[in-house]
Each structure stands twice: as structure tokens, then as C-alpha cells.
Amino acid sequence: DNAEHPALLFVDTISSLGSIDYRHEEWKVDVTVGGSQKGLLLPPGLSFNAISSKALEAYKTSELPKSYWDWGPMLENNKKGYFPYTPATNLFYGLDEAINMLTEEGLDNVFKRHKRFAEATRVAVNSWGLEILCKNPEEYSDSLTAVMVPDGHDADFLRKTILDHYNMSLGTGLAKV
């Protein structure tokens, strides 16, 4: 790779796949992990992994214990067109339709739409007097805006109020930052 460094570059696209421009090969990412929820318009249930030849070679030669990152069995099953479990067929049909919808809108338009929504969200958050976790506007994501709720305030009540008054649904964090 251009960095000539043995480290592998892993990218989590769970919140952004299908929402913002992403180029696994062109940007020389080694491992990309994505999911069906969020930008691909589906419920959770499908996972996507893109693996560079560098990452695959590291996998093959590593003597470290593997569990989650053990791609060997899945790669062998893929060669045979076999799933080692009951596939979520309904999600595959949904994914096919979601890809059709994104293609019909055009990815550039999809990305612009997410940018508009993200900017509107940040304007709203600022107007409510709340703090955006990311301090550098140049690093804002157009697929996720993390908002800090001041001590002594109830985030669930805030989300319900925003939904009831502004018809804007906000997700919840997984843990306290």
C-alpha cells in the first residue's frame, strides 16, 4: 500500500454504507464492515465484509486466535454457493429492492440528500442549545450526528419531545460517553 506499513486499515461503515461516498478499493482499505440497517434501508440482519488481499494474507498467516475474524469457513462456503445457516431470505429480497431504489435515485443524489439532512440536523441541534460531540466541523459525518445531553437532563424525554413537536426521530446511543 502507499503507506508501506504492515498495519491493516479497518473501516466500520455500519452507519454510513449507502449514505455517503465510500470506496474500499480506491482508498486501499483492508477490511470494511457494514450492515443492512441504516443507509441500506433495511432492518438489521445482514452483515457485509470487504477484505483486501493484504488482509486475507494476514488472516492466512496469523497464528493469533480467531473467532469473529475467521473468514476461512465463509470463503469456502461462498465458493460452493452454500450458507452454513438458514439465510435471511426476506432481507435479501429487501436488499435487492433497496439497491434498486438507491440506483434509481442516483448515488450522488442519495449522498446530497444525506448531507442536507445532516446539515439540517446540526442546525436544529445547535438551535436547541445542545452540543455536538464532534468539535471539528470539517470532520462532521453526514450519516451520524452525536449529541451531548447536558447533565441532569433525560435523553429519552428529549427524544420524545423532539419526535412529538418536530416529527424528527433521533436514535439513542449504546452507552454513556
Predicted feature descriptions by range:
Residues 1-24:
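Catalytic PLP-binding core of fold-type I/II PLP enzymes
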Residues 37-123, 127:
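Active-site C-terminal subdomain of aminotransferase-like
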Residues 126, 130-177:
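Conserved C-terminal alpha-helix-loop-beta "cap" of PLP-dependent enzymes
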Residues 19-22, 43-44, 137:
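Short glycine-/acidic-enriched loop or helix-start segments at secondary-structure transitions
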Residues 3-6, 27-29, 43-46, 166:
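Short coil/turn connectors at secondary-structure junctions
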Residues 9-13, 32-35, 42, 134, ...:
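General beta-strand structural signal in soluble alpha/beta enzymes
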Residues 25-37:
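Conserved active-site segment immediately N-terminal to the catalytic lysine
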Residues 31, 46-50, 144-146:
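Conserved hydrophobic/aromatic beta-strand scaffold that supports enzyme active sites
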